[in-house]
Amino acid sequence: GSMNWLRIPRPIDRHIVEMSLRQVDMLPLKDRQIGELSGGQKKRTFLARALAQQAHILLLDEPFNGVDVNTERAMIQLLMRLRDAGHTILVSSHDLSAISTVCDQIILINQTILAYGATSEVFTPENLNRTFGMPLPGIMS
């Protein structure tokens, strides 16, 4: 929802924020100041902020950077549910494992677009070597 012209949150606005915080497991920390949160908690809070806007397109910059393994797993599951519900999710990330799970389409960029398409077609040893300048063992296509 959008706030009224006085910018006073309505009950529906508060409900949307509460639901967004619940989705990222931050509701118990809702009364904390942002400076009191860890890096991973801030990432989840920023994701909740994006969810509260109820947009169908999400643009996320390094969403998995600085979060623990359990938080990353929970975020991936949430993003997959959003994707399956019809949301478009654009992710800028160096975490190839996480994005290969979440993303259907990949663009590899190193000063220019080197490869794009379905994850299985793009994540080849040749493309990854061209992108990162070295072989990346363990990243499977």
Indicate residue ranges for each PLM-predicted region.
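Conserved switch/coupling elements of ABC/ABC-like ATPase nucleotide-binding domains
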Residues: 111-121
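Catalytic Walker B motif of ABC-type/P-loop ATPase nucleotide-binding domains
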Residues: 58-61
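Helix N-cap at the start of a conserved alpha-helix in ABC-type nucleotide-binding domains
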Residues: 69-71
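A short, surface-exposed alpha-helical micro-motif characterized by mixed small hydrophobic
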Residues: 99-101
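Conserved ABC ATPase "signature" region
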Residues: 11-29
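H-loop/switch region of ABC-family ATPase nucleotide-binding domains
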Residues: 93-94
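Conserved ABC ATPase signature
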Residues: 33-37
